[in-house]
């Protein structure tokens, strides 16, 4: 036991938000030290067999839609869980080495990984095994809504009911939390990726042009809006795509109203999930939520007026957390402190 405590003094514990779109790492005592796209570029043999890692993170994301046949840019996470085990493990190895160099005085780190509330036991086991394969000494799992709530400074340890809506790249997690536990949770596989896909589909159907994921993401970030109020400025963006009829590059303009029309279906899915949560939570918790409001975290919280949309559709106040992109990773870091105080059995590390 004493040796274990001494090892802990020389080891930087890590909280990893292993997201579909981005991976964030929080180091105890330092804060967020890594924020990189969850993308890996791999070189392939002519037979299609994996050869080597060409790039990871930002460098790999720049290759999306631009690679020669010998290189494939892969996003190994889909809907918040592992889609490609080998590539995920290599990506984690790379990211952990960026923030933690192991030696005798600094052994392999303890790692806490945030997982979707709706992840199956098989999916959770895959995440845990991937982290161990990437060099973790011990691995704990925490559900993303709990980590998000802790990172957003919600009173998770009290009897008061708190609702958190975490909109990530692959999933939206809706949860009610009370007394250090999740009393209601739902996970819908709708997130930033679905918004991007909807924009790509809309552009193809309406303008007869093809655009890639990076362009769709830029459109979403620059002029995307979940709700347009009377008097709001209608924003425009010039887009360059490949015209299907002419077979040549062409430019056209998109407005914020176009984008709202494009992303209406995924927005409706998120609204439906939130409404269901409000209907199914306990009456006392519902009263707490109506009084204190719902808290938005994750990258999706940055979509313009998404708080306005959810408030108008539910009649409940909506608050966007401070720095919503990092809430899950920061909350996981605080959870590591709780592990030191109470032991690892407070989290789902039993798989």
Curated annotation (Swiss-Prot):
One record GO biological process: regulation of cell shape
Chief location: cytoplasm
Keyword vocabulary terms for this entry: ATP-binding, Cell shape, Cytoplasm, Nucleotide-binding
Compartments, as annotated in UniProt: Cytoplasm
One of the record's GO cellular component terms: cytoplasm
Family indicated by similarity: Belongs to the FtsA/MreB family.
Described purpose of this protein according to its UniProt entry: Forms membrane-associated dynamic filaments that are essential for cell shape determination. Acts by regulating cell wall synthesis and cell elongation, and thus cell shape. A feedback loop between cell geometry and MreB localization may maintain elongated cell shape by targeting cell wall growth to regions of negative cell wall curvature.
Descriptive protein name: Cell shape-determining protein MreB
Underlying gene: mreB
